[in-house]
């Protein structure tokens, strides 16, 4: 990944890219471990991470942190509120690279409007929102979309239930679209895990039926999933250029409602820009949440771009 930023600096002449290349090269050069006295296993104790959005190492660490945070938040929400859960995927059509940044901005505003509608606002208790971007290399287009985990009131599944057609209509309205977008909504029952890949495949099939293109992201994602092959090519440079620009200074995840309150109560810190060394407060075996989706961060260990 570093060589692509170096190539962008040579091509465009912006020192900004050279600085990112330097950060990537020095990322996690030194790792210090301590042995857990309880388990005897080694645990990362000290390290310097570059925190560049497209860095696969930082994305992996960020993924673990977000996954663990969400595990704690979901468990606490269940304990305090005994709420139900739904999983929502909101999509739009693919866009060319130069439209990616403004499209994401429009989606952020559309998402804000969606959760201000009375029908939605009175039915949900909050949300965890994650932005994902996949790329279709054959069409040279990008597909930004949202995955949303939503705690709902117990009576939501009765008279307050919002059907998929209504979610679709509301998202279309919020985004002011002149076409009908693909929206996937499903209930999370009991302790059943959310299989993000299965959901992605369902969405892909639905979009293919409408002759739209969605390339599905997979586990795990490496820097080679952002760029094709090991060589610096014009296509790879454009991919890094557009992704870096679209994601710069942008929050990829967001909490609202009771999930935001619980995040604050648990004093979990910032998973996107905070410490990437200390993932857990206790040196116990990491209980990876079944909600595999929450491995976020562009390129989170599941996401974002796939060749």
From Swiss-Prot:
This is Protein rep. DNA binds at residue 219. GO terms for biological process: DNA replication. Disulfide bonds: none annotated. One of its GO terms (molecular function) is DNA binding. The keyword Ribonucleoprotein does not apply. Belongs to the Gram-positive plasmids replication protein type 1 family. Pfam families: Rep_1. The keyword Oxidoreductase does not apply. Keywords: DNA replication, Plasmid.
